[in-house]
């Protein structure tokens, strides 16, 4: 397994998992304000 391929997969997983988290955090902050 290439290191570049592994880094690409990890970055994809981070982006996919961070997307909804950012949306939830922003909506939570907006709701609190």
Swiss-Prot record:
Transmembrane portions of the chain: 5-25
Keyword flag Transmembrane helix: yes
GO biological process, one term: photosynthesis
Compartment(s) where it occurs, according to its Swiss-Prot or TrEMBL record: Plastid, Chloroplast thylakoid membrane
Topology in the lipid bilayer: Single-pass membrane protein
InterPro entries in alphabetical order: PSII_Ycf12_core-subunit (IPR010284)
Gene Ontology, cellular component aspect: chloroplast thylakoid membrane; photosystem II
Superkingdom of this protein's organism: Eukaryota
This protein's UniProt keywords: Chloroplast, Membrane, Photosynthesis, Photosystem II, Plastid, Thylakoid, Transmembrane, Transmembrane helix
Any matching Pfam family: PSII_Ycf12
Main location: plastid
Effect of deleting the gene: About 15% decrease in O(2) evolution, no visible change in PSII protein profile under moderate light (50 umol photons/m(2)/s), increased sensitivity to photoinhibition under high light (1000 umol photons/m(2)/s).
Subunit structure: PSII is composed of 1 copy each of membrane proteins PsbA, PsbB, PsbC, PsbD, PsbE, PsbF, PsbH, PsbI, PsbJ, PsbK, PsbL, PsbM, PsbT, PsbX, PsbY, PsbZ, Psb30/Ycf12, peripheral proteins of the oxygen-evolving complex and a large number of cofactors. It forms dimeric complexes.
Protein family: Belongs to the Psb30/Ycf12 family.
Cited function: A core subunit of photosystem II (PSII), required for optimal photosynthesis, probably helps stabilize the reaction center.
The protein's name in its UniProt record: Photosystem II reaction center protein Psb30
Gene name as annotated: psb30
């Amino acid at each position: 397994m290439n290191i570049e391929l592994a880094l690409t997969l990890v970055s994809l997983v981070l982006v996919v998992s961070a997307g909804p988290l950012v949306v939830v955090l922003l909506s939570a902050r907006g709701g609190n304000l």
